[in-house]
Amino acid sequence: MVPAEYNSHHIIMKEYLIFLAQSHPAFRKAELESLADLHNIKADFSNHNEEHPFMIVQLENDEEAYQLIDRAILSKSIYELWGHGNTMEELHTDVKKKVDQLKERYIDSSFKFENLTFQGGKKSREQQVAIFDQFRYLEFTGKIKLKNPDQVYTILEQYSLGANLQPLDTPDHIWFGRQVNISARSRGAVEKYDIKKRPYFGTTSFDAELSLFTCNMGQVKKSDLIYDPFVGTGSFLVTAAEFGGITIGSDIDFLTLKGKGPKRRLKSNFDYYKKPLQFTDVLCMDFTNNAFRSNLKFGSILCDPPYGVREGVKVCGSNDPRKEGREKVVIDGQLAFLRRDYIPPKKAYSLDLLLDDLLHFASERLDVGSRLCFWMPVANDEDIPTMIPQHEDFELIYELVQDFHKWSRRLLVYLKRGDDYKGITLTSEDREGVNNFRDRYFHKFSKLSMADKKNSNSSSGSV
């Protein structure tokens, strides 16, 4: 373990303890890395363990610790670490080694103590006070304030569960630290953006927790223009506004954008959260044939492309070749597609082609260093590495898996690189795997879907 403080290039690093959430543990490290990169914080998270709720990191100062956790969704809080041990005796021994240099700045500050446990159940007030009294040797002279104190000192305990799934009598490990900051999660962000609390939501609305997490992975920043090309009911845009993003979206489905009345539409969600100025607009538009000016750039692109399960994958056009080339039809002296009552035809499209279009679009619309984040569904028995779309202008920096037994969805995070970077391009024609997720889904992920059986039968009948 790295010492509590060490001199590296004349910078003294300090130990901090992060209390992690137990939701989506496989995603926690990626979020912390993205937030550290967003704030230009150099930190090593290699000792992260998905099975443990605590992690020690080395940071320069409290400001870095505060920024790292402030908008985190999969972390709870961060503490300047004053000591730790397997028992209370070991903890106090460790704290006493460092206390003189650590407490000097806070000796006169108002304060309170708190006790947090992982899997340990809730202690009675008497039990907590007995633990707090053991730290009398700190000899703080400031006032005790239970509400809004200057400093909060926390004893954190990790317990294991016994055979009856009840916590054991003694903790496995104990930490003591000074609270630096609590996260957006601990301040209630996930509950605040709960889908059912919004005026307008639908069957395709994205989970609040993962929407907020996706915004962090996309490094949404204040005043950045954030775009969702499959906006639906606006889950990503609403949560992007929480982090200061200026939002714009589009969708090919006019009825979704129209909503269910003047008080139950996408804009109503921004009014509900008192962020109307961060909502630019939503456009009824096929993004593969978009109306944006050629030099318009976005800070991030975040989306959940239609899988074809609840909503089919469609773009403007016609599957009937007889109807192609009829764009110049004139009605009453006016081009048909310019009339207010014109409804553009739509045709079915494949998810693979849609993702190719998305990467190409993002390559033209994102500046170097910006991120494209989208969720891609796959059947778990597919050869997944061969199905991931690639573009020469992007580096795939994260592939995060949320498993649903027979299928999974993956958050793919791409970083736009500069001219000196030359990645590979894998379009739907180049990729070996075919993402026929919709067909597999409706046939309950059987080994041979109807389309596969049809191809198999036609092959066996040939000579």
Name the predicted role of every residue range:
Residues 6-68, 118-119, 148-150, 154, ...:
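Class I S-adenosyl-L-methionine-dependent methyltransferase catalytic core
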Residues 100-167, 174:
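A short N-terminal interaction module
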Residues 50-105:
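Conserved AdoMet
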